[in-house]
Amino acid sequence: MTDIIRQLEAEQAAKIEEKRKLPDFQPGDTVRVQVRVTEGTRTRVQAYEGVCIARSGAGLNENFTVRKISYGEGVERVFPVYSPIVEGVEVVRRGKVRRAKLYYLRGLTGKAARIAEKKDNRTKAERAADKLAAAKAEAAKTAAE
């Protein structure tokens, strides 16, 4: 029984991933989430930028929590990974943390709440090669469509 459920969830997740591929991100990363907002009859996309403080759940029930400071007040929002209101996620910067849940940030203010940026130890040539390979893969994908 659970095998069938797991298989159906995997199929649905693959179908959603086809339309909208989310980047790999983890707690500590600063992300910009493109959220679809409906006001009356109009629908628009709004950016919500903050630090990912947690990822929870698995399969279609996977969520991530993003925390930002708005007008001096901490605001947290939980987004389902496979929700249709999430148009896309962009990783702004990678954070260096040693925990999976960063709830301790709730009690910190100002500079104490900052997260160190993860350094990329690859050489410039390696980064350029990776970028070129990604561009070629994207071009091949576009040509196939």
From Swiss-Prot:
Gene Ontology terms: biological process: translation
Q: Does the keyword Chaperone apply?
A: no
Concerning its family, UniProt says: Belongs to the bacterial ribosomal protein bL19 family.
Pfam families, from UniProt?
Ribosomal_L19
PROSITE patterns linked to this entry: RIBOSOMAL_L19
Instruction: Extract the SUPFAM superfamilies matched here.
Output: Translation proteins SH3-like domain (SSF50104)
Q: Which GO terms describe its cellular component?
A: cytosolic large ribosomal subunit
**Key words, A-Z:** Ribonucleoprotein, Ribosomal protein
Question: What organism is listed for this UniProt entry?
Answer: Brucella canis (strain ATCC 23365 / NCTC 10854 / RM-666)
Protein function: This protein is located at the 30S-50S ribosomal subunit interface and may play a role in the structure and function of the aminoacyl-tRNA binding site.
Gene name tied to this protein:
rplS
Q: InterPro entries per the record? A: Ribosomal_bL19, Ribosomal_bL19_CS, Ribosomal_bL19_sf, Translation_prot_SH3-like_sf
Protein's UniProt name: Large ribosomal subunit protein bL19
Transport as UniProt keyword = no
Q: Name one GO molecular function term.
A: structural constituent of ribosome
